[in-house]
Amino acid sequence: MQYQLLINGVLVDGEGERQSVYNPATGEVILEIAEASPVQVDAAVLAADSAFAEWGQTTPKARAECLLKLADSIEQNALEFARLESQNCGKPLHCVINDEIPAIVDVFRFFAGAARCLSGLAAGEYLEGHTSMIRRDPIGVVASIAPWNYPLMMAAWKLAPALAAGNCVVIKPSEITPLTALKLAALAKDIFPPGVLNVLFGRGQTVGDVLTGHEKVRMVSLTGSIATGEHILRHTAPAIKRTHMELGGKAPVIVFDDADLDAVAQGVRTFGFYNAGQDCTAACRIYAQRGIYDALVEKLGNAVSSLKMGAPEDKSTELGPLSSLAHLKRVTAAVEEAKALSHIRVITGGSQTEGKGYYFAPTLLADAKQEDAIVQREVFGPVVSITVFDDEDQVLRWANDSRYGLASSVWTQDVGRAHRLSARLQYGCTWINTHFMLVSEMPHGGQKQSGYGKDMSLYGLEDYTLVRHIMVKH
């Protein structure tokens, strides 16, 4: 198993404190990995800074060829990546193979093509005898911090646009789920010039702070919690670094009386519980109009209770464990707080399961009120709440009454209503009669405390560039 760091094109052992990496399906230790030392973090950043002088000037074609080679290599090693991700995260193996790996490969291939389409504009003559042009240039060294819910996919979302734009990257995966990023490092070593891509391992307080605070780091890209985002913003503010933040969500799912309730129930069964609900866009905050509320609660209860939990390698498993014991305790505490409210009905689930591993039963909580914590705070687990509403204005007000602003969905047969709401919902994405669907060509990112900046799409590529004005006197 690959456990070494990638620094300046060389795989090396970490020199810091050893950390245990767990299998959440069993609670057992997979292996121990040594963190990067402060000296190694410095070496990785300096290597990236040195490599930028040449990599930043390479042609888009050359950068695209490297990204395509990496995509091909991931595809050729798909089963090994899937097994590592499943073992380290508890994800059902078939979900990683069929859903995640193809999407990861596609992200690298999309940005390989996008790199060759990004261009500045010839702006024209705005001053007599002078011609202005616009350039989009790479920024420099980018520090990327990836989360533990989709370790390899989020690494791809960060690496592909940054490298395509001509930046050099030092990435730190979560210390909870580092295995696929370290495997990726071994493949990238023989594809990219030394220093262009560096992969570290370690905790935020020992490695992340040293990395993001380094004077040579020009940009920090984070996918993580609001608390982590606030910390990084405070930590990097004195140096005025560019930041790119994706900080979670609490997606409202608005279901009107005219919606197809069977489609809603099956949709929430998938979109609310995929990856054990550990998804920033999970369909977790349902608002159902009064006329169909009881019927939807019944249909959802039947749908959610039919989800099969089990071992990740079992092909029939739909729901794996949570990522860590600490997170299991957080989810349990959130549900217990909700259950203590007299008006909450537990339709199904509501507790962790017996036996080994960090499993929590798929849970549906009915009759939640707008002010309840279960409605207002991200749980990030297999937990969905449902709240009754009366009219369009009320549900719009409630949906927007959130510090989050990442994703939302509206379920209705009324096209006019769908357009009205999608124009007024304060979320980076609104789906109509579906949820959770993402493609490489379209941007993903939030507003409010869900952060700013876009992943995927040409907008994501532009986020990793600087806009510069060039004026020529003639």
Curated annotation (Swiss-Prot):
Binding site for NAD(+): 146-148, 172-175, 209, 225-228, 280
PROSITE patterns: ALDEHYDE_DEHYDR_GLU
Enzyme class: oxidoreductase
SUPFAM superfamilies, per the entry: ALDH-like
Pathway connected to this protein: Amine and polyamine degradation; putrescine degradation; 4-aminobutanoate from 4-aminobutanal: step 1/1; Amino-acid degradation
Catalytic reactions of this protein: 4-aminobutanal + NAD(+) + H2O = 4-aminobutanoate + NADH + 2 H(+); 5-aminopentanal + NAD(+) + H2O = 5-aminopentanoate + NADH + 2 H(+)
One GO MF term attached to the UniProt entry: NAD binding
Record GO biological process: L-lysine catabolic process; putrescine catabolic process
EC assignment: 1.2.1.19, 1.2.1.-
InterPro entries (alphabetical): Ald_DH/histidinol_DH (IPR016161), Ald_DH_C (IPR016163), Ald_DH_CS_GLU (IPR029510), Ald_DH_N (IPR016162), Aldehyde_DH_dom (IPR015590), Aminobutyraldehyde_DH (IPR015657), PatD (IPR017749)
Keyword Transcription regulation included in the entry's annotation: no
UniProt cross-references to Pfam families, sorted A to Z: Aldedh
Keyword Repressor: no
Active site (catalytic residues): 246, 280 (nucleophile)
CDD domains: ALDH_ABALDH-YdcW
Keyword line: NAD, Oxidoreductase
HAMAP family the record matches: Aldedh_Prr
Known role: Catalyzes the oxidation 4-aminobutanal (gamma-aminobutyraldehyde) to 4-aminobutanoate (gamma-aminobutyrate or GABA). This is the second step in one of two pathways for putrescine degradation, where putrescine is converted into 4-aminobutanoate via 4-aminobutanal. Also functions as a 5-aminopentanal dehydrogenase in a a L-lysine degradation pathway to succinate that proceeds via cadaverine, glutarate and L-2-hydroxyglutarate.
Protein family per UniProt: Belongs to the aldehyde dehydrogenase family. Gamma-aminobutyraldehyde dehydrogenase subfamily.
Other comment: 4-aminobutanal can spontaneously cyclize to 1-pyrroline, and 5-aminopentanal to 1-piperideine.
Subunit and interaction comment: Homotetramer.
Name listed for the protein in its UniProt record: Gamma-aminobutyraldehyde dehydrogenase
Biological source species: Salmonella typhi
